[in-house]
């Protein structure tokens, strides 16, 4: 009656990777962040290029986010002031019924406004009629 137990480690398959969960997760996060950094650099390539040019010239750029290739308006001094009011179409059944335009100034208001509230005279409360109720 011999009890022999096998305390040897279980057989490991050679094709199974030996990376643990924390190391695999760390590698996955490093790959994700590096790919997002590469895509971000490609997306903002014109800003990086203008920053490198300004640093090569020796003068730091005042506004990094401005686009150097954006065309300027041809005649900036001939800009007309924008009208801040817009007409509004009021809805109707099938077609607009009314066009609301902004008022150039506030309408004149009376200085003193009096409101007279009239209450009807109080009548005594009416008592309900009494009816005999049979108790069965």
Swiss-Prot record:
Region (Disordered): 54-87, 112-136
InterPro entries found in the cross-reference section: At5g65660-like (IPR037699)
Organism: Arabidopsis thaliana
GO cellular component: membrane
TM region(s), chain numbering: 19-39
Subcellular location: Membrane
Key words, A-Z: Membrane, Transmembrane, Transmembrane helix
Name of the molecule in the record: Uncharacterized protein At5g65660
Bilayer topology annotation: Single-pass membrane protein
């Amino acid at each position: 009656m011999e009890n022999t137990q096998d305390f040897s480690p279980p057989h490991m398959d050679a094709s199974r990777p030996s990376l643990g969960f924390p190391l695999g997760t760390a590698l996955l996060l490093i790959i994700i962040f590096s790919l997002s950094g590469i895509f971000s650099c490609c997306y903002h390539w014109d800003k990086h290029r203008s920053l490198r040019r300004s640093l090569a010239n020796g003068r730091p750029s005042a506004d990094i986010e401005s686009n150097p290739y954006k065309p300027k308006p041809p005649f900036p001094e001939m800009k007309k002031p924008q009208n801040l009011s817009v007409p509004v179409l009021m809805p109707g059944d099938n077609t607009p019924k009314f066009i609301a335009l902004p008022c150039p100034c506030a309408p004149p208001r009376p200085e003193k406004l009096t409101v007279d509230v009239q209450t009807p005279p109080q009548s005594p409360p009416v008592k309900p009629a009494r009816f005999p109720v049979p108790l069965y």
